[in-house]
């Protein structure tokens, strides 16, 4: 899925666009229809949009249509370039949770290209940081985000919550140094303040 979905959409209707891949895979009409419905639902596309021209859609809807077109083929390897760019926070979360679910259910490899360290911290278990066309860092979240100086040297940073927790540690709060998500920070901080992290 490309960063600019308008370069990926081309057919007369959103439905035809999503069906393009499965049709070229030689699938039957019933299977194509089922995959179109499934992929549209996965991407959060309302069924009322399926018979519209993809060029009438908003930017976020185009992104969802482009993702649906790829998902309809049920790929074993899925490469997405900034899949949540232009989506509101709920849309971002829906797309990334859907990708995580797809990966878990299908066993597919999902590769996401993104500048959002927050998204990468929440949804990726292995990271490769590119700089000038080469791999600059790679490893687990701990291995990559533990090198904040190296990340900053190329214009990236650790997630905001990681920086916040580092400041809290400097102030004396006994927090682990591997907090990369708001959820992990909440779970670590609330008990220290007498709250219940599970509430």
List the model feature ranges, each with a label.
Residues 74:
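Conserved catalytic motifs of ABC-family nucleotide-binding domains
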């Amino acid at each position: 899925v490309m960063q600019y979905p308008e370069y990926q959409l081309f057919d007369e209707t959103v439905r035809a666009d999503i069906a393009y891949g499965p049709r070229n895979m030689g699938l039957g009409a019933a299977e194509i229809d089922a995959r179109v419905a499934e992929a549209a639902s996965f991407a959060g596309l309302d069924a009322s949009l399926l018979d519209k021209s993809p060029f009438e859609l908003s930017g976020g809807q185009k992104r969802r249509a482009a993702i649906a077109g790829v998902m309809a083929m049920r790929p074993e390897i899925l490469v997405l370039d900034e899949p949540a760019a232009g989506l509101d926070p709920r849309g971002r979360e829906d797309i990334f949770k859907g990708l995580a679910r797809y990966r878990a259910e299908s066993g597919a490899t999902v590769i996401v290209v993104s500048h959002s360290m927050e998204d990468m911290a929440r949804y990726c278990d292995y990271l490769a940081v590119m700089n000038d066309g080469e791999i600059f860092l790679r490893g687990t979240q701990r291995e990559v985000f533990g090198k904040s100086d190296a990340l900053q040297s190329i214009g990236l940073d650790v997630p905001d919550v990681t920086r916040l927790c580092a400041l809290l540690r400097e102030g004396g709060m006994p927090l682990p140094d591997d907090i990369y998500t708001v959820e992990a920070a909440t779970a670590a901080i609330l008990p220290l303040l007498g709250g219940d992290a599970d509430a």
